[in-house]
Design a protein with these regions (language model features):
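Conserved, structured C-terminal
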Residues: 1-27, 31, 36, 109-386
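Acidic, proline/glycine-enriched N-terminal capping motif
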Residues: 1-94, 102, 331, 373, ...
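Short amphipathic beta-strand starts and helix->beta connectors
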Residues: 44-50, 96-106, 138, 191-200
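Generic hydrophobic, aliphatic-rich segments that mediate packing or membrane embedding
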Residues: 62, 70-75, 92, 103-108, ...
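Short coil/turn segments at secondary-structure boundaries
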Residues: 62, 66, 99, 104, ...
Length: 386
């Protein structure tokens, strides 16, 4: 059997999508550049609820830069979001679907200028948009700024968030010449430690905050100033263990399975993706075992993204989303009984056969895409995603 060159080849060689994803030894998401814990993940979680927490984003997110006179027009072809109100110094949480209306990815888009859009998020979003950018006649140019899972010397910008009830006061104090008023999901520009930075006003852990970014060479000086002043505000830095739990705090589903693995309509994309791409290396794990991987796909409505689906423009997946607008499943939080959790953990360590599976803390994440069955009286009544 020849070595697969692209994702489509890899799927065929594995005998199907499910076989490929189940056989992969690629584990849960990796957050390079930061230690698992700076103090303890409990204290770090507590800080974004009671004081302020620094969440490092400089190393693990992929960026795609879209430049040109048609940058907005290009993105509007693939994003379900309203785009006619996009102006410089605003951000949007983009929702990207395939032709069948299932989610490919979400990501954050920063409108730096009328002809410059910065896409930041998982590689699935950048891959999807880059593929289509290479097949368009519109006046755009795209460049990638890769994450640091594979080590590299530098990136275009650093990026970190300050989240929690003390975040606003902290940012006001570290701003050299005062903090401009920044509305929700707007971007402001100011100086920290003599360096010009920008900040997107939004929350990631269910609390108010800022996402601050600026030139890579300013990272150490800006972060040092924030940490120095932050000590007075109870600042904690989040390690990778605590960082991975922020989605649960806000109800955001960080990494659902992208709907790109099936269908002739996505075949050319799979043939474009390298076999060793994120999508090609990814694994699926959990108790939800299916023969048809599309059973694991999710729709924007199911993720509470309905308010970001705007039908006043044409985009990929529009007709499918309109057809199933009222038939989506409902996203809820599954809260486990504490006594049951600790009983299962105890039985996984000291009980003789059969032992239970250990529930890893602070998050039970064992694969790239974690999908479990929710059972009631022996019947499956739902499925869970991280």
């Amino acid at each position: 059997m020849s070595k697969p060159l692209n994702l489509e080849d890899k799927i065929q060689n594995a005998g199907g999508v499910v076989n490929m994803l189940r056989a992969s030894n690629y584990g849960p998401p990796v957050f390079p550049g930061i230690t698992p814990e700076f103090t303890s993940w409990r204290d770090e979680q507590h800080s974004w609820r009671t004081s302020v927490c620094l969440l490092e984003l400089s190393y693990h997110m992929t960026e795609l830069h879209i430049r040109g006179a048609d940058a907005k027009k290009f993105v509007s072809q693939f994003a379900s979001n309203r785009m006619d109100n996009l102006v410089p110094m605003r951000g949007k949480q983009l929702v990207l679907s395939d032709e069948t209306g299932y989610l490919v990815s979400d990501c954050i888009m920063f409108c730096e200028a009328d002809d410059f859009l910065r896409i930041a998020g998982p590689p699935t979003a950048s891959n999807w948009l880059q593929f289509h950018a290479e097949n368009t006649d519109l006046n755009i140019e795209v460049t990638r700024n890769e994450n640091m899972i594979i080590p590299r010397e530098r990136r275009d910008v650093f990026r970190f968030q300050l989240q929690g009830p003390n975040a606003l006061d902290l940012v006001r104090e570290v701003a050299d010449d005062g903090l401009p008023e920044i509305k929700f999901f707007h971007i402001g520009e100011f100086n920290i430690a003599g360096h010009t930075v920008r900040a997107l006003r939004h929350g990631m852990a269910g609390k108010p905050g800022f996402e601050i970014y600026g030139p890579w060479d300013a990272l150490q000086a800006v972060r040092a100033k924030v940490e120095e002043v932050g000590a007075r505000y109870g600042l904690r830095k989040a390690g990778s263990l605590a960082y991975a739990t922020t989605g649960q705090e806000s109800g955001w589903m960080a990494r659902p399975l992208p709907a790109i693995y099936t269908g002739d309509h996505n075949k050319s994309f799979r043939e474009w993706l390298p076999a060793k791409s994120f999508e090609g290396n990814a694994s699926i794990g959990g108790s939800l075992v299916v023969n048809d991987v599309s059973e694991v796909f999710v729709e924007p409505y199911e993720l509470s993204y309905g308010k970001m689906v705007n039908f006043d423009h044409d985009f990929v997946g529009r007709d499918a989303l309109m057809a199933r607008k009222t038939n989506a499943r409902t996203k809820v939080t599954l809260e486990l009984n504490s006594d049951d959790v600790f009983r299962v953990m105890k039985d996984s360590i000291i009980k003789k056969r059969p032992r239970t599976k250990f529930i890893s803390l602070p998050i039970a994440h064992y694969a790239t895409f974690q999908c479990d069955s929710i059972m009631l009286n022996g019947n499956r009544i739902g499925q869970s995603h991280m």
